[in-house]
């Protein structure tokens, strides 16, 4: 699929407060993600490299024990197996890109 309208694409709940419209290629998972205000993404890690980009809202992001307030236009690169988590200070829209593909997310669709 070459063209996608994420405004109308079905979203799946990754876990409470985190809702994503996802696409998967052979090597990448792309997520257009909404987080409800106050949502806590607990500290976790995974084998995937991850890019997170803030489209709108405010997110307190923790990476390797360091906290940073991310605002629109800001983002983070999360290396493989790096402990990270977040708190949605406000409702947020973010872009998440993972490699390799998040097979576990495919199973949620």
Predicted features along the sequence, with ranges:
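Conserved short histidine dyad/triad with adjacent acidic residue
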Residues: 31-45
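Short, conserved beta-strand element in jelly-roll/cupin
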Residues: 35, 46-61
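Structural motif
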Residues: 29, 58-60, 67, 83, ...
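A cytosolic small-molecule/anion-sensing beta-strand core signal
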Residues: 55-56, 71-72, 90
